[in-house]
Regions:
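Conserved beta-alpha
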Residues: 70-148, 152
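Short gly/pro/ser/thr-enriched loop/turn and capping motifs at secondary-structure boundaries
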Residues: 65-67, 165, 189-193
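N-terminal nucleotide/polyanion-binding subdomain common to many enzyme families
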Residues: 1-84
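Short, flexible loop segments at boundaries between secondary-structure elements
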Residues: 132-137, 179-217
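Short Gly/Thr/Asp-enriched flexible loops that form oxyanion-binding sites at enzyme active sites
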Residues: 114, 167-176
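Short glycine-rich anion-binding loops that position phosphate/pyrophosphate groups of nucleotides
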Residues: 35-39, 161-166, 189
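A transmembrane-helix-recognition feature enriched in membrane-embedded lipid enzymes
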Residues: 64-70, 199-244
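Proline-aspartate-enriched helix->loop->beta-strand connector
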Residues: 149, 153-163
């Protein structure tokens, strides 16, 4: 899959459909759903940068990332929304018996999400789920916290631990164990599917204001990510653009 350099991250040039098809056909692959926060943290932290760049797909989830790809490389890149990747992957795999495992979040969110998924996709095959305790990504990669995930051997493992913890967990998991499942860091998607949080309307996301919608819902947690990191993203992008 082709990719382009944005800040210091190699972002895949792809679509929602292509990522979903990739997850259906491949094994033992890793996918990071990247927004401006991902790229800023990777720019400032070489350890995170190297881990993210090792993923097989780095999908441009955020509007700023997709727009930057268009401006820098004159391509037709659109947002690869993690929420849409999640649903499209499930839809594409229904008739082939594709199996899914959910790792992260909490029991309330997971149970509500599974209820909603079973209503939307009555034939969905859920291999299992695990809601881990609050531990570091390194501790969570210990066998007692991943044994069920490994034993169930689902086609896709969806990981919702928040960035960068979920990506660091996936990296550690691949490094320590022989895993044939595809591993996808999916952020807040579990909560959106469970409807414990409200996802921004499509038109809001398409004009680049999804971050405002989310900031209003969680100002304390997301203040730094959206107000500081978004500003830094613009600065770093301008620097890259002027250096062309």
């Amino acid at each position: 899959m082709n990719s382009v350099l944005i800040l210091k991250t190699m972002i895949s040039t792809t679509t929602v459909e292509n990522v979903a098809t990739y997850l259906k056909k491949e094994q033992s692959k890793t996918v990071a759903i990247c927004n401006s926060n991902t790229l800023v943290r990777s720019y400032r932290d070489s350890v995170i940068q190297n881990k993210i760049n090792s993923f097989d797909i780095k999908a441009p989830d955020g509007f700023p990332v997709a727009k930057s790809s268009k401006i820098l490389y004159q391509n037709d890149q659109n947002r690869v929304d993690g929420f849409k990747v999640f649903h499209k992957t499930i839809e594409n795999g229904i008739n082939d018996g594709m199996t899914h495992y959910f790792y992260g979040s909490n029991s309330k969110v997971i149970n509500l999400m599974i209820q909603n998924l079973q209503l939307l996709y009555p034939k969905i095959k859920i291999a299992g789920f695990f809601c881990p305790p609050v531990k570091s990504y390194h501790e969570l990669s210990e066998e007692k916290y991943v044994k069920d995930l490994i034993d169930k051997n689902a086609d896709v493992v969806w990981v919702s631990l928040g960035f960068p913890k979920q990506e660091e967990f996936i990296y550690e998991l691949k490094d320590k164990y022989q895993i044939t499942s595809n591993l996808v860091g999916i952020g807040a998607v579990f909560e959106w599917v469970a409807e414990t949080k409200i996802k921004a309307p499509e038109w809001v996301a398409n004009i680049g204001f999804e971050w405002i919608f989310r900031l209003i819902q969680e100002p304390k947690r997301l203040f730094r990510r959206y107000l500081i990191d978004n500003f830094l993203f613009i600065i770093y992008f301008i620097k890259q653009y002027l250096s062309k």
